[in-house]
């Protein structure tokens, strides 16, 4: 299929961040926000080389004058032109490779619309002339990265969360559950509850500030009610944060109220089960014989599982739902932010995987629908 000296590319294009690298790497080479920014003001200085759009970190650094848009929402691409810009930026500016020379492994959330992966396939072959490509399910790659073949992965990124039970390397599609509640919803919720405190964040650029507050200061309480009482009676939980203009804001119970929405989606007005219940429901959809192995191998993955305290809280909540004697183990690897990308790197460098690629030739014969036959 392809020579050994040509490394495959692994691109984990998430709703919030793109993680990209080469097969065989133990960490992504490029990590940048999946953002396309367009100027919201008229350019007046000649010779500045102003562009009509900026991608990734450059958009982030000029956010004060740009309108920032994420081309992916809830794991589904909503703007293909912008997505193409992001891929172009990934290949040419971040990884500095010619896409027509390397096979590329892309990732996607389970239970995504079929049209989404077809279009991904089409763009890779027709716009970038990839020699071969493959679309893998994110959670499955996370399990590879944790060195297991059996377990249930709870993967939560910026756009979508899902639980995928995997037994001896087989994903169990009937038991996969998807929850459209993830990092971006938490950021929006934090924006809302900070407004109640008298701090107003409204623009797309200010949302990025709130995301930073969330990532630096939020944590999951082991006992939410008790934590609320502690916060009300003392200022021990308060932390201050300096905004880019030097103004300092104080945040208290918002620190744990924000990620609490993962366990109580009703906070966001969502009528769905929390992440602990979703995990439990997913396990209960599996065969009774394998549940024990799933309970003992619950793997967390993705950026929205990076909150301190989330593993202990998951342990507590799932223990309360599961049968009393069941051994429950939550695995939260420190590199779980990038475990999808790392898993992709492992998968793409396996010798047994080389016959799994969709080649340009197969694509030319069958069209975009080949992706459903070749990729799980």
UniProtKB/Swiss-Prot annotation:
The keyword Oxidoreductase does not apply. It comes from the Eukaryota. The modification N-acetylaspartate is found at residue 3. It is found in: Cytoplasm; Cytoplasm, Cytoskeleton. SMART domains: ACTIN. Actins are highly conserved proteins that are involved in various types of cell motility and are ubiquitously expressed in all eukaryotic cells. This is Actin, cytoskeletal 1B. It comes from Strongylocentrotus purpuratus.
